[in-house]
Design a protein with these regions (language model features):
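Pre-recognition alpha-helix immediately N-terminal to the DNA-recognition helix
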Residues: 30-34
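Short, cationic-aromatic polyanion-contact patches
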Residues: 16-28, 44, 74-99
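Short amphipathic alpha-helical interaction segments
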Residues: 54-69
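Short C-terminal boundary/hinge segments that cap the last helix of small helical domains
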Residues: 1-10
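Short acidic, hydrophobic short linear motifs in intrinsically disordered regions
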Residues: 39-52
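A contiguous binding-surface segment within folded domains or other stable secondary-structure elements
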Residues: 43, 61-62, 71-74
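Long, low-complexity, charge-rich intrinsically disordered regions
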Residues: 3, 90-187
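A glycine-rich, hydrophobic loop/mini-helix early in the fold
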Residues: 8, 28-29
Length: 187
């Protein structure tokens, strides 16, 4: 019966985003958030313990909570099956993105982006609305390619991998410095 239940669970579609309640639960506890980020990156329990200051009991507690919340299906030996797609996105105005905006973005962009394999590029332009969707889809594919490479490189020894984070964004927006200088109909 357990094998049948596992096969049924394995055929369930993966979530593309979490619910508001799931995200609230994740950000309510810093250790749970760290473990949630690790499992959405599909890191094995052994690597999480080797990398972060967590006891095995704290990890098991977090994995159990993530199972209860519906983000993973916890299996024997602290193994798990992710219930969210690798390319899932946090709710744009949800608790996790609010956490990132408040506590992560400044730290991320304060870096020099001048290290090996690093870059920062800000491009401003005006394009047709139809092409904007095409660019958005291409940017989403870049994010998915990065996620796929991360998964493929999990077979490399830890000392041959480095953590990278990409932030991909595109929105109809004009920075304040440009907006302040923009001509009005009265000019």
């Amino acid at each position: 019966f357990a094998d049948l239940a596992r096969r049924v669970a394995d055929t369930q579609p993966l979530l593309l985003e979490l619910t508001l309640a799931q995200e609230k639960a994740v950000v309510a506890d810093r250790k749970l958030l760290i473990v949630a980020i690790c499992v959405t990156s599909q890191l094995p329990a052994e690597e999480i313990l080797a990398t972060y200051r967590l006891t095995e009991a704290e990890l098991v507690k977090a994995l159990t909570q993530l199972d209860r919340i519906g983000i993973i299906d916890l299996r024997p030996g602290n193994r798990y099956r992710l219930k969210v797609a690798k390319g899932f996105r946090w709710l744009p105005q949800g608790p996790v993105m609010s956490f990132f905006r408040k506590e992560v973005l400044h730290d991320y962009f304060a870096g020099g982006f001048d290290g090996e394999s690093e870059m920062l590029m800000v491009v401003h332009g005006e394009i047709g609305r139809g092409l904007a969707n095409s660019f958005r889809e291409r940017l989403m594919r870049i994010g998915q390619d990065f996620s796929n490479q991360h998964l493929a490189d999990q077979k490399l020894p830890a000392d041959q991998r480095r953590p990278y984070t990409i932030v991909i964004g595109m929105r109809s927006w004009l920075m304040a410095a440009l907006a302040e200088m923009q001509r009005t109909s009265e000019d």
